[in-house]
Amino acid sequence: MLMPKRVKHRKVQRGRMKGVATRGNKVVHGDYGLQALEPAWITSNQIEAARIAMTRFIKRGGKVWIKIFPDKPVTKKPAETRMGSGKGSPEYWVAVVKPGRVLFEIAGVSEEVAREALRLAMHKLPIKCKFVAREDEMGGEANES
């Protein structure tokens, strides 16, 4: 599972997911991508499940890029614990995703295979996503659905 090797602060505040993604919103490495349409916290387990679903379908052909990294720790207090006595201990890691962010990219496979692989990955994630293609050099969209 993905998690940082070391962090400056062990516990962070929850924060807010306002606005749309201004960075990481274009397909840059691969030919096709999976773009988020809703804001959410994506856990490292969900990222890994989506990655496995994609790589199994493309049968190790082609290449997959994971464009998000879970760098935010989420804390949890033990069950049946009274309120107070400090913040809980870090339980898992999440990636903060805003609408428009490209989550995964894929290359080296046909569009039909990429579309199906990303559809399988979409079902492993807690948000609505859409299939996007890399923009051609002239600036227009090559293919979007």
Swiss-Prot record:
GO cellular component: cytosolic large ribosomal subunit
Positions of region (Disordered): 1-20
Any GO molecular function: structural constituent of ribosome
Keywords, comma-separated and alphabetical: Ribonucleoprotein, Ribosomal protein, RNA-binding, rRNA-binding, tRNA-binding
Gene Ontology annotations of biological process type: translation
Stretches with biased composition (Basic residues): 1-17
InterPro entries, A to Z: Ribosomal_uL16, Ribosomal_uL16_bact-type, Ribosomal_uL16_CS, Ribosomal_uL16_dom, Ribosomal_uL16_sf
Tree of life domain: Bacteria
Subunit and partners: Part of the 50S ribosomal subunit.
HAMAP family: Ribosomal_uL16 (MF_01342)
Family: Belongs to the universal ribosomal protein uL16 family.
Function text: Binds 23S rRNA and is also seen to make contacts with the A and possibly P site tRNAs.
Official protein name in the record: Large ribosomal subunit protein uL16
Chain's gene name: rplP
